[in-house]
């Protein structure tokens, strides 16, 4: 018998599929598999399947479920991909990505590297990922995410879960040719979700998507504070 959280999760995810936000089976299966209630502070567990951002401390939020779905669909990760995430937060998006690139890969080759600038949030994410069994497929790094993580570059996919004034140049350099980067870009109040594909050594194609609102991406190649 499914728990209340499992029933609520299925209700929300099925609704997002019905209205066309979730389009692919891989994203549908991943969102059904990851328990969002394990990635929010205890006082917000009962609200885990309200499709809204929730506070996770330090002025940061866990994205609304529909936004995680939109960004994951746009990123289009494949089983076996090596993914870089900028802005770990509570670890929820990283777990969704790990479901696709590692757990949906028969050989478990895929991996997610995720960079968080706030040490306490990185520790929170690690504990959440350990408790839910994803830490094997996710490496959490504390640092300036606007610089990427060159140690494991190039990446098949890069996803940024905070808003930048422009696409950070280090992230473009760390993207594999044929790879894709998804990032919200704009001012501090409203952004446009960009999808950047690297089609050559020095050539990128950018697609402009929906309007969105994210917390600012702080760092050397982002907002300064």
Swiss-Prot record:
Reactions catalysed, as given in the entry: [protein]-L-isoaspartate + S-adenosyl-L-methionine = [protein]-L-isoaspartate alpha-methyl ester + S-adenosyl-L-homocysteine
Subcellular location: Cytoplasm
Molecular function GO labels: protein-L-isoaspartate (D-aspartate) O-methyltransferase activity
Keyword Glycosyltransferase applies: no
Cysteine disulfide links: none
Active site: 63
UniProt KW keywords: Cytoplasm, Methyltransferase, S-adenosyl-L-methionine, Transferase
GO cellular component terms given for this protein: cytoplasm
EC class name: transferase
Any single GO BP term: protein repair
Gene3D superfamilies: Vaccinia Virus protein VP39
Enzyme Commission code(s) on record: 2.1.1.77
Function recorded in the entry: Catalyzes the methyl esterification of L-isoaspartyl residues in peptides and proteins that result from spontaneous decomposition of normal L-aspartyl and L-asparaginyl residues. It plays a role in the repair and/or degradation of damaged proteins.
Similarity comment: family membership: Belongs to the methyltransferase superfamily. L-isoaspartyl/D-aspartyl protein methyltransferase family.
NCBIfam families in UniProt: pimt, PRK00312.1, PRK13942.1
Official protein name in the record: Protein-L-isoaspartate O-methyltransferase
Organism name: Staphylothermus marinus (strain ATCC 43588 / DSM 3639 / JCM 9404 / F1)
């Amino acid at each position: 018998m499914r728990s209340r959280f499992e029933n609520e999760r299925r209700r929300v995810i099925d609704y997002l599929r019905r209205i066309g936000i979730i389009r692919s089976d891989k994203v549908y299966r991943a969102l059904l598999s990851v328990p969002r209630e394990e990635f929010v502070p205890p006082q917000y567990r009962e609200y885990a399947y309200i499709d809204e951002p929730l506070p996770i401390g330090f002025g940061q939020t866990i994205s609304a479920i529909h936004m995680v779905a939109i960004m994951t669909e746009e990123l289009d990760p494949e089983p076996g991909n090596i993914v870089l995430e900028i802005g770990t937060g509570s670890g929820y998006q990283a777990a969704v990505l790990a479901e696709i690139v590692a757990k949906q890969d028969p050989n478990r080759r895929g991996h997610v590297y995720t960079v968080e600038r706030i040490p306490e949030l990185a520790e929170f994410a690690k504990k959440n990922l350990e408790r839910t069994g994803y830490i094997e497929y996710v490496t959490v790094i504390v640092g300036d995410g606007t610089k990427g993580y060159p140690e494991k570059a190039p990446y098949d996919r890069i996803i940024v879960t905070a808003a930048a004034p422009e696409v950070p140049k280090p992230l473009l350099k760390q993207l594999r040719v044929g790879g894709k980067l998804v990032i919200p870009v704009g001012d501090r109040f409203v952004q446009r979700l960009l999808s950047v594909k690297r089609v050559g050594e020095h050539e990128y194609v950018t697609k402009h998507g929906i309007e969105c609102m994210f917390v600012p991406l702080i760092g050397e190649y982002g907002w300064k504070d």
